Amino acid sequence: MTRVLLALVLLVAGAVSAEPPRAALGFRADLVREARAVWGLQAPVPVFAAQVHQESAWRVDARSPVGAEGLAQFMPLTGVWMTELYPAALGRDAQPFNPQWALRAMVRYDAWLHARVVGHTACDRFWAMLRAYNGGLGHWQAESRFAFDRGDRVSVDRWCGVARRAAVHCRENLDYPRRILTQHQVRYAAWGVQVTCDG
């Protein structure tokens, strides 16, 4: 009886932890709308929600020690650059602490990166996109040039810290897509189409 009760408690605890945090719920409609406007009706909204989860834990006022700001943790110069790329959608002033602006800019930046990376599978390509968002497209491109197979994330990931990026940054950069695609995304499964990965 004790084992059955313990199993039930663990099952319930697991189900609760797999839910989106309360802070995320108020942004769901905005994120779905912004993602579908850029990516279409089959937009992988759970990926984007998991990305915000990883970046800021849905804190509008989040500020990193290195200067990244807001829900999507844009660095100030990246935010300004986004307004130059997409002035009609984002206006002339970067507003990283405005949640609607941050979500709108993030899905556009993700699409911009997605168009510049390769992958044999959706997982490989989104993995590369997320690594580029976290650590810079130039670093990912340098690593992919060394890789035996540019479309395979494992082949590219092996070159982290060898090609151009300092090895000290590899753990965070390689963990970033793994957490988003294999841990956090499941919390947001009800929000839309997921990108499945084997781990």
Residues covered by each model-derived region:
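Cell-wall polysaccharide-cleaving catalytic domain and substrate-binding groove, primarily
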Residues: H53-T78, G136, I180
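Non-catalytic cell-wall polysaccharide-engagement segments
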Residues: S17-D30, W39, L77-R108, W112-G199
